[in-house]
């Protein structure tokens, strides 16, 4: 039937179509939760026209929002729910699914990183999906760094001694330090010794870049997130933060390229004896793993710096805040250090036998993981889990860590107990699972499964060696109350402005 026969004109149809289109658009914009099964836990409030305030509430209170949602009595969100995050809408999954999805290839971490960290935009390519440096980095860390740890402990200890003398000083009077600022260069120097060898670990320009690049990177990430995706490549060309990021990468290339070219030339000239003379550092491991493939050495080095230095510094900083007002625990740790290192020296067996220290570090991670949402992924297909939970293709997911402070799992779960995992290791079947580097659905600050942090064994070694030096060489105490943890979305940081007081003491054994 012709519309005109009913007295309906084309202009009326156009106006009606526009009205319907505007209404649909308004519903999508004003009520975004209807696009997600079960709605959004932290949707916009009445009269809020955008998600800006919802994102701000998430940034300042994500831990409480997530925990409350899972604990709701109506059971509506007992398994999973959608939230507006500072990274768009994501599905928050209960930790009971961690073991099931840990090795599921339908959940892609590289796709998540590319989408979340602008991996296709110049300056952010280190997080581009399937970029060659990503696989080289993972393989080099898993196969070479972890395997070489025993030979690296002595050199790491040497760098800790040097860095503490410079940044913590030998002052025997009580004085205040900004703890995070004092820890960061110590971790950066020892890490650079392993990543770049003796040639660059004392290079002031490289040290500046390796410390600053993580901050520059995440500031640039946040700067682009305020733009619609389609405009981000253009915005990145003019953003001062993105320009600074690209400049740091170019400076890193200028520093590392001559070192790499010189090594390649030397190895070609002495190829018959190359295997016995090659340095034992990440530059060399990347070369061996690449096996002739072209890659960006500076980008690979900066990626491991972004992944390792600040997170390791954060763990050590928070650990020192946690124990600074516990002299009895500090004394027990010193006794363990003297007994263990005094007997074994810097060997892997010594680090393994620092069981109380291991417990203190794992307990610190339990109460304050670097992120309260881990195992971040994007689903590559529609997924139905074993109990029927459905996750649509293209969904950004993360697993909540709220069971790490669950009173049903841990006694006095809201309290710091440095001896907790030390005692648990004594129980049958708990010796391995209670170690810092072990992961499980009840403690997965390092992630869990196939993509658990590949550098966690190295990070554990660094923190333990540094803590041995600090506790034997310095007395420490809090300045006032313990500094609050800084929360920003799912991220949790040791307070960068928090201070402690220290003074040099005479160590009982040589380190």
Curated annotation (Swiss-Prot):
Record-linked Pfam families: p450 (PF00067)
Biotechnology usage: Shearone derivatives produced by this cluster are interesting candidates for Alzheimer's disease (AD) therapy since they moderately inhibit aggregation of amyloid beta 42 (Abeta42).
Coiled-coil blocks: none
PANTHER family associated with the record: CYTOCHROME P450, CYTOCHROME P450 MONOOXYGENASE AUSG-RELATED
Location (main, coarse): membrane
Protein's name in the database: Cytochrome P450 monooxygenase esdpI
Gene Ontology biological process terms, A to Z: mycotoxin biosynthetic process
Example GO molecular function: heme binding
InterPro entries linked: Cyt_P450, Cyt_P450_CS, Cyt_P450_E_grp-IV, Cyt_P450_sf
Signal peptide (UniProt feature, chain positions): none
Cofactor: heme
Compartments in which it is found: Membrane
TM spans (from-to): 14-34
Recorded family membership: Belongs to the cytochrome P450 family.
UniProt keyword terms in alphabetical order: Heme, Iron, Membrane, Metal-binding, Monooxygenase, Oxidoreductase, Transmembrane, Transmembrane helix
Role: Cytochrome P450 monooxygenase; part of the cluster that mediates the biosynthesis of shearones, diterpenoid pyrones (DPs) which are structurally diverse meroterpenoids consisting of a diterpene linked by a pyrone, and which may exhibit a range of bioactivities.
Binding residues for heme: 453
Origin superkingdom: Eukaryota
Organism for this UniProt entry: Penicillium shearii
Entry EC number(s): 1.-.-.-
Membrane topology type: Single-pass membrane protein
GO cellular component, one term: membrane
Pathway involvement of the protein, from the record: Secondary metabolite biosynthesis; terpenoid biosynthesis
């Amino acid at each position: 039937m012709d519309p005109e026969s009913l007295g309906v004109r084309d202009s009326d149809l156009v106006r009606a179509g526009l009205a319907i289109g505007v209404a649909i658009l308004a519903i999508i914009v004003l009520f975004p939760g209807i696009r997600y099964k079960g709605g959004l836990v932290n949707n916009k409030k009445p009269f809020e026209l955008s998600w800006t305030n919802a994102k701000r509430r998430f940034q300042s209170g994500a831990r409480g929002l997530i925990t409350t949602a899972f604990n709701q009595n109506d059971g509506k969100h007992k398994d999973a729910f959608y939230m507006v995050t500072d990274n768009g809408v994501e599905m928050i999954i209960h930790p009971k699914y961690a073991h099931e999805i840990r090795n599921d290839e339908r959940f892609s971490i590289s796709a998540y990183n590319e989408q979340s960290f602008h991996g296709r935009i110049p300056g952010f390519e280190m997080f581009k999906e399937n970029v060659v440096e990503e696989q080289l980095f993972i393989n080099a860390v898993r196969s070479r760094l972890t395997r070489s740890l025993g030979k690296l402990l002595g050199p790491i200890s040497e760098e800790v001694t040097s860095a503490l003398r410079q940044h913590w000083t030998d002052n025997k009077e009580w004085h205040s330090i900004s703890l995070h600022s004092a820890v960061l260069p110590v971790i950066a120097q020892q890490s650079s010794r392993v990543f770049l060898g003796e040639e660059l670990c004392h290079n002031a320009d490289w040290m500046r870049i390796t410390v600053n690049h993580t901050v520059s990177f995440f500031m640039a990430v946040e700067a682009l997130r305020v733009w619609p995706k389609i405009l981000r490549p253009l915005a990145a060309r003019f953003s001062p933060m993105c320009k600074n990021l690209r400049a740091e990468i170019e400076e890193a290339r200028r520093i590392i390229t001559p070192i790499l070219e010189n090594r390649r030339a030397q190895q070609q000239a002495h190829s018959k004896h190359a295997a016995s003379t090659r340095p034992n550092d990440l530059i060399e491991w990347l070369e061996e793993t690449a096996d002739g493939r072209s890659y960006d050495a500076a980008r690979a080095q900066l990626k491991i710096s972004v992944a390792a230095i600040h997170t390791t510094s954060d763990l050590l900083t928070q650990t020192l805040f946690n124990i600074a007002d516990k002299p009895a625990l500090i004394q027990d740790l010193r006794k363990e250090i003297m007994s263990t290192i005094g007997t074994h020296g810097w060997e892997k067996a010594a680090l393994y036998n620092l069981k109380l220290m291991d417990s203190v570090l794992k307990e610190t991670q339990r109460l304050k993981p670097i992120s309260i949402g881990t195992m971040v992924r994007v689903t590559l297909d529609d997924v139905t889990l074993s109990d029927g939970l459905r996750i649509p293709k293209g969904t950004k997911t993360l697993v909540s860590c709220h069971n790490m402070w669950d009173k049903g799992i841990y006694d006095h779960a809201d309290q710091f107990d440095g001896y907790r995992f030390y005692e648990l290791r004594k129980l049958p079947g708990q010796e391995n699972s209670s170690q810092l580097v072990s992961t499980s659905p009840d403690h997965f600050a390092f992630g869990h499964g196939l993509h658990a942090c590949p550098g966690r064994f190295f990070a554990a070694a660094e923190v333990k060696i540094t803590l041995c030096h600090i506790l034997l060489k310095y007395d420490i105490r809090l300045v006032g109350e313990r500094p609050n943890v800084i929360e920003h979305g799912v991220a949790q940081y040791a307070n960068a402005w928090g201070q402690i007081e220290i003074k040099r003491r005479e160590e009982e054994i040589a380190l």
